[in-house]
Swiss-Prot record:
Protein's name in the database: Mitogen-activated protein kinase kinase kinase 1
Result when mutating T1381E: Loss of kinase activity and autophosphorylation
Annotated positions binding ATP: I1230, G1231, L1232, G1233, A1234, F1235, S1236, S1237, C1238, K1253
Cofactor(s), names only, from the UniProt record: Mg(2+)
Compositional bias per record (Gly residues), positions renumbered to this chain: 24-35
Keywords: Acetylation, ATP-binding, Kinase, Magnesium, Metal-binding, Nucleotide-binding, Phosphoprotein, Serine/threonine-protein kinase, Transferase, Zinc, Zinc-finger
Subunit (UniProt): Binds both upstream activators and downstream substrates in multimolecular complexes through its N-terminus. Oligomerizes after binding MAP4K2 or TRAF2. Interacts with AXIN1. Interacts (via the kinase catalytic domain) with STK38. Interacts with GRIPAP1.
Membership in a protein family: Belongs to the protein kinase superfamily. STE Ser/Thr protein kinase family. MAP kinase kinase kinase subfamily.
Amino acid sequence: MAAAAGDRASSSGFPGAAAASPEAGGGGGGGGALQGSGAPAAGAAGLLREPGSAGRERADWRRRQLRKVRSVELDQLPEQPLFLAAASPPCPSTSPSPEPADAAAGASRFQPAAGPPPPGAASRCGSHSAELAAARDSGARSPAGAEPPSAAAPSGREMENKETLKGLHKMEDRPEERMIREKLKATCMPAWKHEWLERRNRRGPVVVKPIPIKGDGSEVNNLAAEPQGEGQAGSAAPAPKGRRSPSPGSSPSGRSVKPESPGVRRKRVSPVPFQSGRITPPRRAPSPDGFSPYSPEETSRRVNKVMRARLYLLQQIGPNSFLIGGDSPDNKYRVFIGPQNCSCGRGAFCIHLLFVMLRVFQLEPSDPMLWRKTLKNFEVESLFQKYHSRRSSRIKAPSRNTIQKFVSRMSNSHTLSSSSTSTSSSENSIKDEEEQMCPICLLGMLDEESLTVCEDGCRNKLHHHCMSIWAEECRRNREPLICPLCRSKWRSHDFYSHELSSPVESPASLRAVQQPSSPQQPVAGSQRRNQESSFNLTHFGTQQIPSAYKDLAEPWIQVFGMELVGCLFSRNWNVREMALRRLSHDVSGALLLANGESTGNSGGGSGGSLSAGAASGSSQPSISGDVVEACCSVLSIVCADPVYKVYVAALKTLRAMLVYTPCHSLAERIKLQRLLRPVVDTILVKCADANSRTSQLSISTVLELCKGQAGELAVGREILKAGSIGVGGVDYVLSCILGNQAESNNWQELLGRLCLIDRLLLEFPAEFYPHIVSTDVSQAEPVEIRYKKLLSLLTFALQSIDNSHSMVGKLSRRIYLSSARMVTAVPAVFSKLVTMLNASGSTHFTRMRRRLMAIADEVEIAEVIQLGVEDTVDGHQDSLQAVAPTSCLENSSLEHTVHREKTGKGLSATRLSASSEDISDRLAGVSVGLPSSTTTEQPKPAVQTKGRPHSQCLNSSPLSHAQLMFPAPSAPCSSAPSVPDISKHRPQAFVPCKIPSASPQTQRKFSLQFQRNCSEHRDSDQLSPVFTQSRPPPSSNIHRPKPSRPVPGSTSKLGDATKSSMTLDLGSASRCDDSFGGGGNSGNAVIPSDETVFTPVEDKCRLDVNTELNSSIEDLLEASMPSSDTTVTFKSEVAVLSPEKAENDDTYKDDVNHNQKCKEKMEAEEEEALAIAMAMSASQDALPIVPQLQVENGEDIIIIQQDTPETLPGHTKAKQPYREDAEWLKGQQIGLGAFSSCYQAQDVGTGTLMAVKQVTYVRNTSSEQEEVVEALREEIRMMGHLNHPNIIRMLGATCEKSNYNLFIEWMAGGSVAHLLSKYGAFKESVVINYTEQLLRGLSYLHENQIIHRDVKGANLLIDSTGQRLRIADFGAAARLASKGTGAGEFQGQLLGTIAFMAPEVLRGQQYGRSCDVWSVGCAIIEMACAKPPWNAEKHSNHLALIFKIASATTAPSIPSHLSPGLRDVAVRCLELQPQDRPPSRELLKHPVFRTTW
């Protein structure tokens, strides 16, 4: 029979069915062995028996099915069915009675599913039992080996359903068999099981908890021995759904399950349906995932990192959220448990989330909840319950508190720490372990650490460092300092000195800094404590100094302390910036104090030596010398910091050091120059920084150093009567540039120096160009020295022309060519440049020489160069020997002039006149005079040059040049008194221009500047600013806007204007004029000539000569001369100008006015639109008056009726009764809340229709009742003061019996939500109208520091016309703590309808006015769709909706049918970040509201 059954299974069409089916897996007696040993023989036997025994087999099959049904109803035998086949003697294949065979077959049906047989099976039975076991092995092996997984999966799914019949065969798809199977399932399975199975099948494979097993594989024996039926056996027996059955050769522990991460335990989720006849519901499944996404090594590394991280638990800011802080008070992160995310934005499993899970919740690293992406509600609740129980257990310790209070009275803090430790050691180990953990950083506390104690409260110990961070958090929130555990007031005031104190207020900290000669520990400790009191670096902790810098930092530590120096090496740039701020404070204070003691000759501890030093005019090397030396060493390192704010802080420290450092002697200057040299070298590298702000600031810093005592970095500038001589100005900077010759492969150093050289030549031309004459002859350097300076810089640039870095080579070539163009006034110098180029052997020699000769052709000195250098050297020497006359300077209207003569071919022919057409053709962009400052720290005089013609773009086309001409008025010699008026506006520097063309912004600025200048100093019809610039050829690569060429008429006016007298320096006939002029005169000459064209430039301007050398070098870095609109300067970033030193920059104002005309026009239109909107809403109907509800001025608006008990003081007693059902009647109910109801009402005396809101204030406890009464009073008084057309108005309020009655005006149209439910979604015009009125009302509320917090359709009421909207229901409204947007007291409160609430409110974060703006966007969606946002009507669980909104990364979907304007308003309102949402007043300026007027 068994053979026949197996035969039928064999013929089913499944591959390997004889082995996979239960009958084939082990039949009765020899039949099973026969089938297990050879499938062909079994198939042959089946074919022989099939025709004659079909009817008998069908009857036997039915009997077996009925027997199985009965076996399900009764508890099955625990042990006998499993081992019946092994214990019974071998029986023949044709057994006379079917029961033993059926029992054996039934037993064999469990074996393939249960996995491999126990190892002791062969020993418990004879040889034939061993054969049966082998047969079963072969039958179980075939599905795993020969059969593919897809074929085995259906069988596994059928056998996995443990609630089905144990002996149910794997039947085929015959109709009658399928029908019987469904009936059996329906009769034997409860309804809840059906549902649970369907859910499990939809969910996919489940994770089964592995059963603990022994090495000998004895768990199968235990399963067989325990009478647990299908519950335990079924968990191990069926293979997981969709997975392959285990191979029998493997150990029992080798079941096919998903690999786990080390140490992660699995929770069993499969239920136990039948256990002792009981049916139990399924257990709740835990959250999915639970596996670490990292390798075991990476997982261990991350866990260890979290356990060492300097993070701090600041507070629980919401139901399921924490605020986590770092060492810096600005680093705060919000961690949300459940969604498992953090505000840091670093993705899943960030260090802050792991900190909460491992240290706050104290999970084990092997806990599966640690690595789950989401947690279920019950898991979150369990974590928080354990957390709160741990915290409360630390607070409730009265006996220990009592003991330690006595101890604290009798001992100092050290004794207190030891006594508390000894007391806690007597308690149980778990609590003791809890007591020894700091509640802020959640790490253990050691006796050697600095600890503090909550003296008035819970008596818990905390780290001193952690408590300082908590104190800073309290200070920033403007809250009193309390214990983070018990919330009691903190007695100690050690943590509240956070304000920065001035040097006068805290001289002790300065003296501590000034004593490096005694580095004993007590001094260092007191020094650090004093520094903490001023700048509070304590919450940054002790930072580790890298080993490579320990030797370098050792002298720093001796001067400034370990804490400050350690913070300079912090990985957090905020910490480094704060450390530099404190360093600046300490250095300036130390230098100021030392200078004050020395200059004042005061006595004291070291007064003798300081006074002696002061008498000799030198600074104190014992005090200020070490401070300056250590500070310069620090700055040479920190100035290389890549963070811009840290770099700015370093430059501020440099300025603070220099302005308080006196320098009186040459020896002090040399020492200061030596100390500053590494700092300047570091800044020079920054001059070529990729960040344009950094490069601009670096160049501006060095330029301030070049200005010497006239700049912001003047030595001893802030010291009264210092008389410092400075560090050398331009000469010192030149020594820094040329002293350390940068290696050719270090392109950053080369490029930084070249960028600075480019600016130096433009900013200080009088320092380098021999032909520029200074007015201050006594302070001016000889022209030979300037000539040597220029040649040294050009030699440096020439060395880098062939540099492999393209930008270095281009900038070098540009500097060389631009300098050559500037020295065309002195042909000898120009010839020297040509000679230097010839000797360089550059690969660019041919091209560079061609350009130099083209420049010579333009100014007509080419023949001089061709005649030879010898003919011009003598003339050049004569030119250098000439002294600028002083008489002409005294009579000149300008401070000095630059003269050049126009030379003929032999330098002998000189023309004294020229036509205006010739002048216009020969105007040059270099003819610009600019102010500067000398090396001797005096401001440089202005410069006058005469125009000269030249081609700016030296390519094949001679017309491809651009000329920039700035005309200016010429003043007669009698106008000399105007000189002080001009010079008084001037800054310290003059900026001649960069050789590439000026940017359009610069041109516009100069245009405005010269318009103003001309209007002040001349008649408006004489001159006009003219830009002369021709377009480049089409082949040029330069794409810049070019102004148009002036007409000849304007140029002739310019020539006429220059006929007045001017002063020229005509020292020698051999000196060349710019382009034309008188050549034979010597000495001073006043030449009123037509051809004399010059350009005096107002002192404050910064010019760009529009000179384009070639397209190949024109595309250079713009960083060397930034545009005026985005320029970053030392003054704007570092220096703080005092009011008396601040200068009025009218040019800047004009430029701003020019740039903002369009913006101001738009803003004016928007303000006008806003004014119209407010005016339209200003008028409203008069509010009906109810006599009994009127109160006099100064009285409380709430009127207490006579029958109300006198338990509510502060209200107005009723002069006339106004009681329900007497003076007013209550109508139908129109609203219902948790503690309030809203009704229609009528005043009996006047017939006025009203809406009355009745709120009961009676609560269970007196404290709760007081809170309710106070909230109601606040709402009523708030509404009593509001008066706006879009805010609901209140007629009055009474207190009667146990209710407050709020009488508000009747809005017959009902709420927006009511209209939407009745009439459907609004048209867009209606939505716009209502939205505008809503924004008007909110703008009024926000201006009165009120946030509504419950804006939704149900709280927006419409009048009887449908045109007026009013905001109602201020039960959730609150007054802001201040006029600021943020209000800390509102965090954690969940008020209002969830679907309309902003995400930050649901997350428990701080919120303000912007939460109402978010609700406006939600109201737009509701009015446009007639349903709330987020599909809220589909969420029956409000917690699920809260989670959805709080964890949303996108705004709710906006209806697609909205117009772009209204859609833009909704998008602006629904910005996820509160700071990105515009205020309601700004939204009223949107064009969508203006188009409807």
